[in-house]
Amino acid sequence: MKNCVIVSAVRTAIGSFNGSLASTSAIDLGATVIKAAIERAKIDSQHVDEVIMGNVLQAGLGQNPARQALLKSGLAETVCGFTVNKVCGSGLKSVALAAQAIQAGQAQSIVAGGMENMSLAPYLLDAKARSGYRLGDGQVYDVILRDGLMCATHGYHMGITAENVAKEYGITREMQDELALHSQRKAAAAIESGAFTAEIVPVNVVTRKKTFVFSQDEFPKANSTAEALGALRPAFDKAGTVTAGNASGINDGAAALVIMEESAALAAGLTPLARIKSYASGGVPPALMGMGPVPATQKALQLAGLQLADIDLIEANEAFAAQFLAVGKNLGFDSEKVNVNGGAIALGHPIGASGARILVTLLHAMQARDKTLGLATLCIGGGQGIAMVIERLN
């Protein structure tokens, strides 16, 4: 089977809900990272076979957002593209699908990633609007909740699944708040030291009032304290432990990577950054969706012929502190190896982009620390997980 390599990896800075990127569509964010990934890879855009982009909140974006983004990036009309919706795993699944196509001999060069603007997600009228309301009130649905954050199986918020995990695995409020504080501190330190500079591409933001360049993550709370986190009320269950402070945010952003067949990359004189060793998904009960990374990671490690102890750095999406801690407890994560520059609790979670974002961040962290093996993994709403193992190439 053909080897797949990553030859470039970029992301936008992550915007807060209704923050700096609120006027920039997911398609424009996607176009920005697609163009930048190709430029960083130093490949001829004519050699791009396909573009695969994750995007969850597609309502109102128009046909096939990935195709729109690739055209806006300047790629030729002959380049095909498709959009992936695997909820929080969409961006990483896009990379896995790119690898599969290359391994199958269907392509040599694919741009893969994810894009999301949660700030611009619309509201929907219920189905009665199609046939007429006649009598009574209608209902308006929030696309963020309906298509992104509500469990379609059980009809409750993802936060309740985190409460379920906390109860099932004995994860206390204090443990969750401590993890959240560590995430905030690591992210603040990473921003201060410029650790994200190499992976972030600037976004030119144009509004009616001003034009500016957005290039730094704005969601982290650098001044967060244990006292402030402890004072927050539970967000989903009055007697619960999950709060706005120990959960990820609602955010905007995009990320993209150029994936190539290894021999083709070398023949073109390129220097691959990493080899994709394995990828896998796993299913769990929807009520405990946060545990999805456990079977996914176990499968990915088995396919790579590795043990968790072999992994040098891990990026595990912090959808909620409760699920992150339970996953780490179950798999036996070494806390010194995980989310070394902070995670989604601090940086944010633009759901369709996060899978690609954590892979981009993982790769750059491995480069900065001269590490060889990395693992990226996320839980997925509906009761799934996804994981990928990469090997950095010198």
Swiss-Prot record:
Keywords: Acyltransferase, Cytoplasm, Fatty acid metabolism, Lipid metabolism, Transferase. It is found in: Cytoplasm. Pfam families: Thiolase_C, Thiolase_N. Its EC number is 2.3.1.9. GO terms for cellular component: cytoplasm; protein-containing complex. The keyword Lipid metabolism applies. GO terms for biological process: acetoacetic acid catabolic process. It catalyses: 2 acetyl-CoA = acetoacetyl-CoA + CoA. The active site is at C88, H349, C379. Coiled coil: none annotated. Its main location: cytoplasm. Pathway: Metabolic intermediate biosynthesis; (R)-mevalonate biosynthesis; (R)-mevalonate from acetyl-CoA: step 1/3. InterPro entries: Thiolase, Thiolase-like, Thiolase_acyl_enz_int_AS, Thiolase_AS, Thiolase_C, Thiolase_CS, Thiolase_N. GO terms for molecular function: acetyl-CoA C-acetyltransferase activity; identical protein binding. Belongs to the thiolase-like superfamily. Thiolase family. This is Acetyl-CoA acetyltransferase.
